[in-house]
Amino acid sequence: MFCIQCEQTISTPTTKGCSYTMGMCGKTAEVSDLQDVLIYLLQGVSDYAVKARSVGIVDQAIDAYVCQALFSTLTNVNFDAARIIAFINEAQQNRDSLKSRYEAACLLAGKAPEAATGPAALILTADKAELLAWAPNAAVNRNYKEIGEDILGLRLLCLYGLKGAAAYMEHARVLGQQDDEVGAEFHQIMMFLGTEPTEMQPLIDCAMQIGQMNFKVMALLDKGETETFGHPEPTRVNMKPVAGKAILVSGHDLHDLEKILQQTEGKGINVFTNGEMLPAHAYPAFKKYPHLVGNYGSAWQNQQKEFAAFPGAVVMTSNCIINPNVGKYADRIYTRSIVGWPGVTHIEGDDFSTVIEKALSLDGFPYDEIPHYTMTGFARNALMAAAPAVIDQVKAGNIKHFFLIGGCDGDKQERGYYTEMAKAVPQDSLILTLACGKFKFNDLEFGDINGIPRLLDVGQCNDAYSAIQLALALAEAFECGVNDLPLSLVLSWFEQKAIVILLTLLSLGVKGIRVGPSVPGFLTPNLLNFLNETFDLRPITTVEQDLKDILAA
């Protein structure tokens, strides 16, 4: 086992990355090694997807499969070895399907097909022991002594960024948004990484290409969400329990939330969101369901305590899941899509009757707690509508600075930095936030500036797209570049979606980003120095020092 993809990975002066019997996330060495094999085989599928496209063959089902399977290897998504082996078997079937169709098309065209090499030529059995025996050949650090730590770090930056993009592509596909050009670009990048590149500049270019591609993906996802559910509107959300039977929906998948709401109508069940599902309350399509009563709990790292205390059924629609046996709720949590945990019931299709039956059999909340509200829904449309008023307040000198403080949350004590930073932001500044990092401070009162709330919850992690659109609109209004705006980005990262959002921002030329609570373990001192010199990317220090530097710039 070797895994260094998330922020909680082992990091000491002598050891970088999880490499023992279990990762810090709870992933076993067995699952980690199987995921390495899966990624290697997926690069072979992409190789043949590129070849097939050269003869006019595009298979959207296989395009979707590759993203789904790669998504399953993100942090806190799938811990089930049997499910990973099923993905491995499907990878070889899909590759062989593309191969046979590609070779047949070449034969018809009277040209010789390109020979398969590397991942595209690998044939493995379905036997777990044999897969694990072969796994060292697919380890992400398999030849680091020959290539050096800098090249390995760049390969991993690209791979982990591509994982994040794959997740967003799958979220978009579920909502009917699948773009063949983006799919082609994705396969080309996967194929490139499968060649085990050893040159620094092509890998840097690849990282920027992933960022640019993900900007298109975020636009697709934004389109899918807004065309399906309407544009989010500023909305007040109750954060306290409501009496009655209950289902909790966590993850990111709005499609699943809609199906659950439809199937629970009239059944006396209240539906609560959790974590990154909080922004769902702002979509017009969900406001017609009175039994969507509020949000329960906070960020992913608190689920073992919060889910254990929740007296109903829980549905995990995407990341992040952690060991449900700790809180003894494995018998009432259900996984969806690419999510998996051994022994937990997995739901295929859109029938949530099993979840509903479980919720009805449980006690539910005995009484209403005193409501406590937070605001969400300041996504692209709402921000664009507010932009003229914001611009007027900037010109009047009432708004002097914008802060984007958000990203992934986690359980490290150092993440208290983000709470203190939000508290310390001057009263003449607006704070935009997104993703589960908002839970570090969204229960605080920030007031407003002449009717404009000082805290603006943009939405889920992918709604960084909305924040980017606001920045572009402000830059246009003030006839300057984004980097010339009084805008500071203070981001918290944890997993691969955050990595691809960072690459997206860097590929758009955004500079001066602060990242914490620590820097990614796969980035070497040389790579960090390059990112600092090229993009002014820097780690957080202290609230006092960072705020002083930001406001003095």
UniProtKB/Swiss-Prot annotation:
One of the protein's GO biological processes: response to hydrogen peroxide
Catalytic reaction(s) noted: A + NH4(+) + H2O = hydroxylamine + AH2 + H(+)
Pfam families: Prismane (PF03063)
Residues holding [2Fe-2S] cluster: C3, C6, C18, C25
Keyword vocabulary terms for this entry: 2Fe-2S, Cytoplasm, Iron, Iron-sulfur, Metal-binding, Oxidoreductase
Cofactor(s) for this UniProt protein: [2Fe-2S] cluster; hybrid [4Fe-2O-2S] cluster
CDD domains, A to Z: HCP (cd01914)
Residues found modified as Cysteine persulfide: C408
Gene3D superfamilies to which the protein is assigned, alphabetical: 1.20.1270.20, 3.40.50.2030
GO CC annotation: cytoplasm
Residue numbers binding hybrid [4Fe-2O-2S] cluster: H252, E276, C320, C408, C436, C461, E495, K497
Molecular function in Gene Ontology: 2 iron, 2 sulfur cluster binding; hydroxylamine reductase activity; metal ion binding; peroxidase activity
Entry function: Catalyzes the reduction of hydroxylamine to form NH(3) and H(2)O.
Membership in a protein family: Belongs to the HCP family.
Name of this protein: Hydroxylamine reductase
Species per Swiss-Prot/TrEMBL record: Tolumonas auensis (strain DSM 9187 / NBRC 110442 / TA 4)
Name of the gene encoding the protein in the UniProt record: hcp
